[in-house]
Amino acid sequence: TRVASGDRLVLIAPGYDECEPSRSPVRSRVERGTRPPNESPGTEVVRRVLVLGWNLRVPALAAEFGTYGDERYEMQVASKVPVSEREALLKHGPTPSPSVTLTHVEVDFTDPEEMQALGPGTKDSVVFMGADWTDSPEEADARTLMGSLMIDEPLREGARRPTVIMELLDPDNATLVSRSRGELIISPLFLSHLLTQIALRAELQSVFDELFAVGGVEITFRPVALYTQSRPFSFEELERAASAVGETALGVRARSTGSVELNPPKTKAWDDPSDRDLVTLVTT
């Protein structure tokens, strides 16, 4: 992409001072390609997702899954909300892609027997959605926390553990969730951060629209081993490897701790690629 007069750059930095033009010599040009890393054309991946709970974000989630061209999703939604109400809301939302198979089950996932019947251990991902039909955010979070506790021990004893994602509505409840039990999203806190950023810099809305809208550009994690087998390996090496396949390297995540280092120094190096994921910006 050539930068034209009037274009504005999107920079990732610790603060505004670090966004000033550098006086250091310009690095050599990095070639940019388009081929996804280590993927065979036409290979379709089937992912099984169990969604526990229902709110107005579930239709958008199904639509987002449908934007991944080489992946097919079998999405099962379990909630106390009547299936007829869910289907009525789906008709007014984004049309799911044919690559997404959506099935509904009307159950109370806080009941141990009904949770076991859903077979969370057989899924690739388990997503707890904060219920919007309860009397309060606290009650919705209580259901999410109860459900996560019920599946925690069986999943730990299983041969493979699915990815667990929990949506909470009250930030005060975040301390009740151990990182080892899954990834955590606090929707109101996340939205407040976005609104604050947009209020300070209105032009950032176009960036967030691109990142969070269905399709387009997204941030994802991919194993470092897809980009390099070097020991040690530097972030500059990852930048070049990602650019060669049409991606933009943003940082590195340690799998063992879940910690993320964004925009590290180019010379920063790590020893073991098997314990690291690349945080990368990709186009779906």
Identify the residue ranges that each predicted region occupies.
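Cytosolic regulatory regions of ion transport systems
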Residues: 1-284
